[in-house]
Amino acid sequence: MRHASLHALTTAGLLTGLFLGSSLISDASAATADQALPVSVDDFNYIDTSNEPTDQTAAHEKRLRAFMTALRDDVTADRRFELVPSSCAPNCPTEGPALVDRLREASQAGTQILIIGIVQKLSTLVQNVLTVAVDTTSQRVVFKKFFTFRGDDDEAWQRAERFLSEEVRDRLLKSRSQQ
């Protein structure tokens, strides 16, 4: 099962291309600590590898939209960050030349950090989330966060979003303070 999960994430592109061998701490975040950090959050991709007999695509799309809205709302509510609207939707790139172009485009729009990710449903009650924050200027990884959450209902997705939101904001501020 673990190999299949890694294969699905690799296939999704988040463990290949730009991210292999990247530095975990970027030299970006050049804005001073008293300025809001410009961040853009692209729509995450969703992969269901659970092989459940029931098609839950509509429910998963709805939960993913709510997850993304809440994540962006959390970034907006935190005055230490400035949310720059994402210009790619749906199917935001996560690897290769398309991602390099996306980073360039985000940088030109004023984004300093681009957050991308994927949610993968492994089984009836287990899902993985991989999130990567990339400095748009240096095109280096600021951080990666991989975690598993249990459940496939609104409450489980909300808990996962709250956890990720705190992690993203804390890690961005930590990387910024290490400048």
Where are these regions (language model features)?
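N-terminal secretory signal peptides that target proteins for export/translocation
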Residues: 1-6
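Bacterial N-terminal signal peptides
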Residues: 10-23, 27
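C-terminal/domain-edge helix-coil "capping" segments
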Residues: 30-39, 43, 48-49, 69, ...
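Short acidic, glycine/proline-rich loop/turn micro-motifs
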Residues: 50-56
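N-terminal, post-signal-peptide region of Sec/Tat-exported proteins
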Residues: 57-89
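Short, mixed-charge, low-aromatic patches
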Residues: 57-63, 117-124
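Short, solvent-exposed, polar/charged sequence segments at loop or secondary-structure edges
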Residues: 76-116
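Generic recognition of short, well-ordered alpha-helical segments
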Residues: 97, 128-129
